[in-house]
Amino acid sequence: MLGLKGLVGTLCWLAIPTLALAGSTSDNQGVAGLCLLIGIVVSVPVFALLPFVQSHFATDGKLKRFFQPLQVMRLFSRAPMAHLFSLFLILVLALPLFLLKVEQVPREFLWTLSLLFIAFAWPSRMLAGWASGRGARKEKPVRWWLRYPIQFFAAPISFLFAVIFYLTRYISWNGTLSLLENHVFLLPAPFWLGG
């Protein structure tokens, strides 16, 4: 039941940016451009917060934790460097895994790729928990003159990842459908929709 709650909460966060990015394949250039703009703009805060929202949910398994982003932002303000460091590593560790989606792998070899996906995803989850734990142990936020510049850098990191995430549909054998196989936030598996 915990996994189902996590999936539902994560899908709520990813629905708008993912569907908007998928909508950017429209034949109408105006609609496609608008969808791309909406998808990228909405993806930036989603990608910056979602790993920590998932970590917040994992503390007690209550679905309502997915809808408390202010709690996560408070934790971020108490340990901004830990959150920025872990966000960077979470998104960087996800990048090489996109290359494994270039060509469809025979079904009998999928388990080997799944092990690789889990090996990259597990440290990411641990980093998110570590950063959230550091924020939870501190009483007060870091001084604003230090906190705001650090928090500012989360946006370009997430923006760059959102652009790369969007472009991966051009190298994935699954095309636009690969946007729904977001191994960073959903199942750490290579081809769970079309495999």
Segments predicted by a language model, with ranges:
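Cytosolic/matrix-facing juxtamembrane and C-terminal tails of multi-pass cellular membrane proteins
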Residues: 133-194
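Alpha-helical transmembrane segments and their membrane-interface junctions
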Residues: 11-25, 86-108, 161-179
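Long, highly hydrophobic alpha-helical transmembrane signal-anchor segments
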Residues: 1-37
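Enriched - but not universal
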Residues: 16, 114, 125, 147-148, ...
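Membrane-embedded alpha-helical bundles that form the substrate/pore pathway
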Residues: 6-10, 40-43, 159-162
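Interfacial aromatic "cap" segments that immediately flank transmembrane helices
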Residues: 1-13, 51-99, 139-157
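Selective recognition of hydrophobic, aromatic-rich stretches within alpha-helical transmembrane segments
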Residues: 26-66, 99-146
